Regions:
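Residue-level detector of high-confidence beta-strand sites
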Residues: 38, 90-92, 135
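Residues at the starts of beta-strands that form the adenosine-phosphate
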Residues: 9, 32, 235
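Conserved FAD-binding catalytic core of PHBH/FMO-like flavoproteins
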Residues: 86, 103, 114-283, 296
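Active-site-adjacent segment of FAD-dependent monooxygenases/related oxidoreductases
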Residues: 46-119
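Accessory recognition modules or surfaces
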Residues: 2-11, 38, 42-54
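Conserved mid-domain beta->alpha element of the FAD-binding
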Residues: 12-32, 36-39, 162-163, 189, ...
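Acidic/histidine metal-binding catalytic segments
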Residues: 70-73, 131, 266-284, 342-350, ...
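C-terminal helical "tail/cap" subdomain of flavin- and related membrane-associated enzymes
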Residues: 2-7, 84-87, 318, 334-447
């Protein structure tokens, strides 16, 4: 086994949020990074993206200028009655930052991406700036040689290759993972609403709540509206779910022609009139294709690993997709830093898989449950005493804020490293959680 830290030449396939995050993490760890983006620009499509404390902490640790992303700092989660709009379940986040050390941010996806890209590529900050090459679509990888072959005829050899190329990952298939995916039982249309326009029309100003707001989700049906404020509250991002038989968009990709607003309103004859009036002025109405992926058997092979949606695509109902990609990036940055990396890429990737696969798989499963039961969603899952319609599949297995935010990735990495190296781990932690930590559902870590 190689001994001692060495600087690696790293290739990152995919220039989205996950790709830029891992470029920053590896840059901070002292490595040379090239990001390859298949399109002629590195950007993002979509609208709002949620970044809870378990994601935000890494942005701060990496020195990202979070204010560039123009975030909304969330103060509560509100679940409203489908017909009346009255709150059914509310979870306060007033002491969230004080308790967990970092804010719960909502970003516009494009702003968040620009914020990360600037940090990865700029001259300021620790580590060599990452390089970005566009129009480089991955065609194949020679796993023995560590060489990436691109569709434009270029080849590039790297010590480490990170597949951050999203839900339709090419790298995933090259590693031999061919998922059996199936359409979700719900469809989703997304729309943006200008707060200024809503206020001028005399509609409710939801931006004042600084909240993630939900209509429905309590009765086991697929009907649900999710409101995410972003751009400092200037933009309201609506995700509108309904049974797939009322509209199947599995063959339509985001970025095609906008759907008519009448199509957005049609599934909801009994929806709360106040939020329905917001949807009526919605623009950029786009379908979001939803697919259910079973957990993948592994995340790495040879000198290649998967990150984010390439490695563990999940339903959006825990608002943890971006955070899981950021955590993946953080894990790679830690494992390959000067404290832990001893020069052996294979060992490091084995540790990465041991750290990330169980946690991401757990969130993946919890997101699927929250699709039809809002009480399974982090936050609401601890609201048993404050919600008359509270019901979950198994209270002992619910995902909680404590499990997400009390997690110490450094301790998890150390534990998995000792396992791989045949050493003893003595710190009072289990998979990054402190022994003795009591969850709201009564579960005690290590008991």
């Amino acid at each position: 086994m190689a001994q001692g830290w060495r600087q690696l030449d790293v290739g990152v396939i995919g220039g989205g949020i996950g790709g830029m995050s891992v470029a920053i993490a590896l840059r901070r760890a002292g490595h040379n990074v090239t990001v390859y983006e298949k399109h002629d620009f590195a950007g993002e499509v979509g609208a709002s993206v949620s970044c809870a404390a378990n994601g935000t902490r890494w942005l701060h640790e990496w020195g990202v200028d979070v204010q560039k992303g123009d975030p909304v700092v969330l103060k509560s989660l509100i679940n409203r009655d489908w017909k009346t709009g009255e709150p059914v379940s509310t979870f306060s986040l007033d002491d969230y930052e004080q308790k967990w050390g970092y804010a719960y941010n909502m970003f516009h996806r494009q702003y968040m991406h620009a914020m990360l890209k600037d940090c990865a590529l700029q001259g300021e900050g620790a580590g060599p700036p990452a390089k970005l090459l566009v129009n480089h679509a991955c065609q194949d990888i020679n796993l023995k040689a560590g060489t990436v072959i691109f569709k434009n005829g270029v080849t590039a050899k790297h010590d480490l290759i990170v597949g951050a190329d999203g839900i339709g990952s090419a790298v995933r298939g090259i590693l031999g993972i061919h998922p059996a995916k199936r359409p979700a039982e719900s469809s989703c249309l997304h729309a943006n609403v200008s707060t200024d326009q809503a206020v001028k029309l005399g509609l409710v100003d939801y931006s004042q709540n600084d909240a993630l707001e939900y209509w429905g989700g309590q009765d086991g049906t697929w009907d649900k509206i999710v409101l995410s404020p972003c751009n400092g509250g200037k933009l309201l991002s609506y995700y509108c779910f309904f049974p797939r038989e009322r509209g199947d968009y599995t063959t339509q990709a985001w970025g095609a022609d906008d759907r008519p607003v009448e199509e957005l309103l049609a599934p909801y004859p009994e929806l709360d009139a106040q939020v329905k009036a917001h949807l009526a002025i919605g623009v950029e109405v786009q379908p979001w294709r939803l697919w259910v992926h079973d957990p993948y058997p592994y995340l790495q092979k040879s000198n290649v690993c998967l990150l984010g949606d390439a490695g563990h695509p999940m339903m959006p109902h825990q608002s943890q997709g971006a955070c899981m990609a950021i955590e993946d990036a953080a894990a790679i940055g830690i494992i390959f830093n000067k404290s832990y990396f001893q020069g052996d890429v294979r060992e490091a990737l084995e540790v990465y898989e041991k750290v990330r696969l169980p946690r991401a798989t757990r969130v993946q499963a919890a997101a699927a449950k929250a699709a039809y039961n809002i009480n399974e969603r982090i936050g609401f899952s601890a609201n048993k005493d404050n919600c008359a319609t509270y019901k979950v599949e198994d209270e002992k297995k619910t995902l909680t804020i404590e499990e997400m935010n009390a997690y110490d990735m450094y301790k998890d990495v150390e534990e998995k490293l000792t396992q791989v190296r045949g050493e003893k781990f003595l710190a009072p932690y289990v998979s990054g959680l402190p022994i003795g930590l009591q969850m709201p559902n009564g579960v005690i870590v290590g008991a």
